[in-house]
Amino acid sequence: MERREFCASLLAGGTAGMCVDLILFPLDTIKTRLQSPLGFSKSGGFRGIYAGVPSTAVGSFPNAAAFFVTYESAKQLLRSDSSYLSPIIHMAAASLGEVVACLIRVPSEVIKQRAQVSPSSTTYQMLSATLRQEGIKGLYRGYKSTVLREIPFSLVQFPLWESLKDLWSWKQGRAVDSWQSAVCGAFAGGFAAALTTPLDVAKTRIMLAKAGSGVASGNVLFALHEIWRTQGIMGLFAGVIPRMTAISLGGFIFLGAYDKVRTLMLREQ
């Protein structure tokens, strides 16, 4: 990847990610509380819906930037002239991007979610308590479950986003505009969000579980089984509506803003 493309992906991805995470933070808080083992009301209800936002503010830019730099680099590295291979290349690039981005995302997500279900505690208090009780390892609790959520999500979202853009571009005989890319992103994100909600619930339960419990071990299948055993299908899809809403809106803003900022930067350089 050329330096100008690297810088464009870095800044466009980071800017888009930070905008989305901060704008849609209240919906994310509601979703997390619906998925909490304590239940919505005991986790704070509609009170303190910006609890944990400092963690997101710190982690959003580097997380999104890391994803898109890896995604664009992998796409170029795996580039093929065959149109049939394009979806596979997009899937592989997105998966690699998620593995890298989760190294930054997971510590931020752990602290954010614990603050969201304990609105009386500050982000700093949550960080201190996690480090004191579990050490650095505690910040990465749920890394595997997050990757196992993000990879299937990206395997659906990004190839679908790219395919919808290609189809729209072919229909109108020119490249899609930023707003059209955003519409494609909203549809792709919402669809992927619905399909992967059970994995998101499992990830939330693992991150919020008491240290030493079976769920806290990080075994996704065990977490899914426990949710199914105690709450059934409703438990597996807890928070699906706010998750779909947030990610659809997020896809519209995130992928539209990413395309717009990246195009502008490459045009100016």
Curated annotation (Swiss-Prot):
Solcar repeats lie at residues 4-77, 85-167, 176-264. GO terms for molecular function: S-adenosyl-L-methionine transmembrane transporter activity; S-adenosyl-L-methionine:S-adenosyl-L-homocysteine antiporter activity. It holds the Pfam family Mito_carr. Coiled coil: none annotated. It is a multi-pass membrane protein. The keyword Transcription regulation does not apply. Keywords: Antiport, Membrane, Mitochondrion, Mitochondrion inner membrane, Repeat, S-adenosyl-L-methionine, Transmembrane, Transmembrane helix, Transport. It is found in: Mitochondrion inner membrane. One of its GO terms (cellular component) is mitochondrial inner membrane. One of its GO terms (biological process) is mitochondrial S-adenosyl-L-methionine transmembrane transport. Belongs to the mitochondrial carrier (TC 2.A.29) family. This is Mitochondrial S-adenosylmethionine carrier protein. It comes from Xenopus tropicalis (Western clawed frog).
